[in-house]
């Protein structure tokens, strides 16, 4: 698409996590679209690998995450202090060879598109330590300097001597402070510092843009809403229905279109506690499949399942829990569900709603924050704070086949507003302003 290819650096902060996050999905999709625009993609990781002078050992060590060095408690504390003191000097990133000698197909679905990989051991934590002491983002200095950095998350790092763009997905730590563990003072300090030093900000919805202006005080002309996109391979998206049905039954022992689905972290923001109460009260005749790793306050969110006695036993029989499934199987489970339930308290975008719509699965979601903007008229909207409303929504979704068919039809149309081509064009227009 572009006449003069450049190199754009993105961070691998969330990409290195073994279990997926929404920001990791964002970063992977971003890397693919940068490549499709015609630019080269460089990814900065912070693996604790052996940055040997031997290229082969450096490549092997980078991918051998289980063998990477992790200091003990006191060693880690001393190390963080030393790097905090050296903060103003910045950090050097070294190239990681990617020759193909290491077989990476095992985790191919977690890898971004990339042309180059850089690594600076523990760079993200070290930058946080330095920022606490100095109040300045640490400079990162790769040997082959990219032309621009697009950080996928607010972090105290900058690419020295080049434009720096930061994606701020939402203001949840400040909007709903009781739903996250973030140090709110440190978070606000970082956002305000980035407002003074960043070249530009990206966000993912008009709702989030308003929050950045109203809460963080960032000037609207310094924020571009690119929205997000989902890139689901055709082989998964177009898999025959009978094959989807067999895989759903074999993997989860569930019938095709005979279960409801939620996926996401088990944390207060996702509202899983009210969802479980509403689902159990609805007495619908299909099970609920919950996919998600237990996070902060998960015990509180899952207390209806963890209670003792007959009530807890009955609830556990109706709710199937899985901590994590790989992306290809997640796509199959979305396609096989009767409906997707996503009554989150607050979302900067709401990727699960878009993924479900793209796959033709009816969606029940919140009528708050960005979700009305993303789902439009293609979802059954409920008040996420009203358990009775969620309960009635579940009953309606399960009982009304005509409604499900209509939501599926509308969802496929609505999802096209966030097609990769549209997302790519918005990114291209943004990057042209800084390259």
Q: How should each PLM-predicted stretch be described?
A:
Residues 1-435:
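Carbohydrate transferase catalytic cores enriched for Leloir-type hexosyltransferases
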């Amino acid at each position: 698409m572009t006449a003069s290819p450049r190199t754009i650096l993105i961070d691998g902060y969330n990409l290195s996590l073994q279990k997926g996050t929404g920001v990791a999905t964002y970063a992977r999709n971003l890397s693919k679209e940068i490549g499709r625009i015609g630019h080269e993609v460089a990814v900065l990781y912070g693996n604790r690998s052996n940055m040997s002078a031997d290229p082969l050992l450096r490549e092997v060590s980078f991918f051998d995450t289980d063998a990477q060095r992790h200091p003990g408690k006191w060693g880690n504390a001393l190390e963080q202090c030393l790097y905090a003191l050296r903060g103003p000097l910045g950090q050097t990133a070294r190239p990681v060879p990617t020759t193909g000698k290491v077989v990476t197909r095992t985790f191919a679905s977690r890898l971004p598109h990339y042309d180059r990989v850089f690594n600076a051991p523990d760079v993200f934590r070290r930058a946080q330590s330095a920022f606490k002491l100095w109040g300045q983002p640490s400079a990162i200095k790769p040997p082959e300097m990219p032309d621009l950095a697009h950080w996928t998350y607010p972090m105290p790092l900058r690419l020295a001597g080049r434009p720096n763009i930061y994606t701020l997905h939402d203001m949840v730590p400040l909007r709903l402070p009781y739903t996250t563990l973030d140090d709110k003072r440190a978070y606000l300090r970082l956002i305000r510092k980035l407002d003074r030093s960043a070249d530009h900000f990206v966000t993912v919805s008009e709702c989030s843009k308003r929050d950045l202006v109203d809460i963080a005080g960032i000037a609207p002309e310094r924020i571009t809403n690119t929205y997000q996109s989902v890139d689901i391979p055709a082989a998964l998206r177009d898999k025959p229905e009978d094959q989807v049905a067999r895989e759903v039954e074999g993997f989860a022992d569930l019938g095709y279109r005979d279960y409801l689905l939620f996926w996401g972290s088990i944390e207060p923001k996702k509202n899983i506690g009210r969802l479980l109460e509403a689902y159990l009260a609805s007495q619908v005749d299909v099970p609920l499949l919950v996919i998600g790793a237990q996070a902060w306050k998960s015990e509180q969110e899952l207390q209806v399942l963890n209670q003792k006695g007959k009530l807890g036993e009955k609830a556990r029989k109706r709710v199937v829990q899985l901590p994590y499934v790989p992306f290809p199987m997640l796509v199959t489970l979305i396609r096989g569900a009767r409906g997707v339930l996503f009554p989150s308290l607050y979302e900067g975008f709401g990727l699960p709603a878009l993924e479900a719509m793209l796959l033709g699965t009816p969606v029940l979601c919140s009528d708050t924050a960005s979700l009305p903007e993303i789902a439009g008229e293609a979802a059954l909207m409920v008040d996420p704070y009203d358990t009775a409303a969620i309960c009635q929504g579940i009953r309606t979704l399960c009982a009304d086949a005509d409604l499900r068919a209509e939501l599926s039809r509308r969802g496929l149309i609505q999802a096209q507003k966030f097609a990769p081509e549209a997302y790519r064009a918005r990114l291209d227009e943004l990057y042209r302003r800084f390259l």
